[in-house]
Structures are given as C-alpha cells and as structure tokens.
C-alpha cells in the first residue's frame, strides 16, 4: 500500500484502476482452476494415484505455460485441460478393465462436458478442453501450444510413474517435445 501511495503521489503514470481490474480478473480465473481442482479431487473418490497424477500434470502444464509466456486465456484452458485430462480413467477401468489411452480418448468427451456444466467456463473453451482431452494420447496433428504443452506435461509425469527407459525418453525428446521449457525439464529430470 505504501508503494502504491508513493507512485500515485509522484505521477508514476500507472493507471491503478486498470491494474485493479486486471488483478481481479486473474484472481477470478485462478478460482475457476482451483474450483476445478477441488471438483476433480472429489470426482476421483479418494484414488490417490489418480489425484496425484493429475495434480502433477497440472503443475508441469502450469509451469511450462508460464515459462513459454502463454496469454492468460490459453493458460487457463491449458490448466483446466490438465486438471481433467484423465477424467475417463475410472470409467475405462470399470468398462474395459484398463485405462488404455485410446479408450480414454474415446470415452472422455461426454464426461468433460458434464464436469464443466456448473463451472463458469465458456462453451467454446469446454469444446476445446474436450477435444484436447480426446487427443492427449495422440502425438500427431498437434494444432496448438496448449496441445503441445499438455502432451509434454503428461509425458513428464508418466515417464516417472511408469519408469520409462532412457531410450524412450530420448525418442520423445527427438520426436515430440517442442517447447524450450518442456525440453529443459525432460533433460533435467530424465537425461542426466
């Protein structure tokens, strides 16, 4: 508060009214992601593996998105997608006996739509999130930075949880990873 008063009294040129609006918008968007996280934790009904997995993917996605300088809207869509990216795993385990990636992609769209129906997320964004979740095990046809970062964040977590070989990690580095931040993380974690 002291710094703000100093700047206001010394004609800093900063429009604090606009700054306050920007801060409130960011806080509102952060609450949407936080509410989605809480809802997803409840959705997984105590499955610590599923909960910890999505939280790790969300954390990597959030970090990579920020490091790559995503605009606020793309960052929010990315984070919400990371939260729900494995939403169909419980259904797939029950229906097919496993959570195969292609089956996850097939089963996820209606679950994503239902999940977001009572959260303040634009219909256009829900469609994008649903599409991304329905492709998060497909490494071709990447059509945006949100998709690219989701693939990288999920792989960073899966590589550790499933003890992928050094050769597998090296292959992904050469064929899938594109962002500078994702590449740095992959090398730092798995290729030392």
Model-predicted regions and their roles:
Residues 57-60, 102-118:
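An active-site-proximal "capping" alpha-helix that borders the catalytic cofactor pocket
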Residues 33-56, 88-99:
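Active-site flanking loop/helix segments enriched in acidic
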Residues 2-7, 11, 23, 27, ...:
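Divalent metal-dependent phosphate-bond-processing catalytic cores, especially two-metal-ion Mg2+/Mn2+ enzymes
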Residues 9, 16-18:
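Compositionally biased, low-complexity intrinsically disordered regions
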Residues 66, 88-96, 113-117, 121, ...:
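Short helix-capping and hinge/turn segments at secondary-structure transitions, especially at repeat
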Residues 75-97, 108, 130-137, 154:
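His-Asp-centered metal-binding catalytic motifs of divalent-metal-dependent phosphohydrolases/nucleases
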């Amino acid at each position: 508060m002291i710094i703000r008063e100093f700047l206001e009294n010394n004609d800093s040129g900063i429009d604090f009214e606009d700054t306050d609006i920007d801060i409130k918008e960011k806080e509102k968007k952060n609450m949407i992601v936080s509410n989605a996280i809480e809802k997803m934790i409840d959705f997984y009904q105590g499955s610590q593996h599923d909960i910890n997995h999505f939280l790790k993917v969300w954390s990597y996605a959030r970090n990579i998105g920020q490091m790559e300088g995503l605009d606020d809207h793309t960052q929010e869509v990315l984070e919400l997608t990371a939260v729900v990216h494995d939403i169909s795993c419980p259904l797939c385990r029950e229906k097919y006996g496993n959570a195969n990636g292609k089956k996850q992609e097939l089963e996820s769209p209606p679950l994503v739509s239902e999940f977001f129906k009572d959260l303040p997320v634009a219909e256009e964004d829900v469609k994008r999130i649903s599409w991304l979740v329905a492709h998060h095990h497909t490494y071709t046809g990447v059509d945006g930075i949100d998709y690219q970062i989701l693939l990288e964040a999920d792989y960073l977590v899966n590589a550790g949880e499933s003890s992928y070989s050094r050769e597998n990690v090296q292959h992904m580095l050469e064929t899938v990873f594109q962002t500078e931040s994702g590449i740095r993380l992959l090398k730092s974690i798995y290729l030392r």
